[in-house]
Amino acid sequence: EYTERMRKAGGGKLTLKKGTYRFQYSVCIPSNVTVVFEDGVVIENIFDTKAHIKPATAMWQLVPKNMTYKNKAIGKYNGTSNAKMIAKGKVVFDMNYIKGLSIIAVHCKNIEISGITFKGMNGNHYIEVNGAKNVKINKCKFNKAKKGSPQKAYVKEAINIDMADEITGGVGCTWAKQDKTPCVNIKVTNSVFQGMSRGVGTHNYSQTKKKKNIYHSKILIKGNTFKNLYDAGVYLMNWKNTKILNNRFIKNGKGN
């Protein structure tokens, strides 16, 4: 595939023209790759095929494809670096209410995601930011997710800030080391969140062998709108050196 050629070449640029693209499996993005989505691009997650093969865990994974075949191959921030996913105009990632994620950003660094509209989440997250450093998510829209309950199919954060920890089940990628790497310098700006449980947050925490808490740090949540969320706009758990600035919170906490 194109991104695998780019990995072997040391990087590159992939431009998707206007149209609907149906994903059954993950597209992997290696280092030094920019994916540009032109106006009118729709990425759909699908389930039903003649082969009835289950969909992948995520539509996009920020990881070199050759590493996904190896068990616990990547840890710390040593995965994909210097990668961008940029929308030019109206671009939609539609999960079609299939359980899974839109984007997995695990053990990576220097990542930018911009201008994308997400919809159709079911029981997971739109973006999993996990053990990552220097991630910018800007001018995105996160729309309605399928409702659940705390007992069943509870829809958590649109953007989950987490760490790989086998005790908490923080990440399900077999290629990721469960090394409790925290997130550092994560910026979520100028985005809109509406119609789900939470906007941005963490719902589990990890500790060292000596039972000391491990903290995500340098989190910036700025200039966003959180509207009609069942639970909370921002759910902080074990964050430090965090700034939450100039956001709008409208009719949140109504219950899932």
Stretches found by the model and what they are:
Residues Y2-R7, R22-P30, N45-F47, K72-Y77, ...:
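Short, T/G/N/S-enriched strand-turn elements that build extracellular solenoid repeat scaffolds
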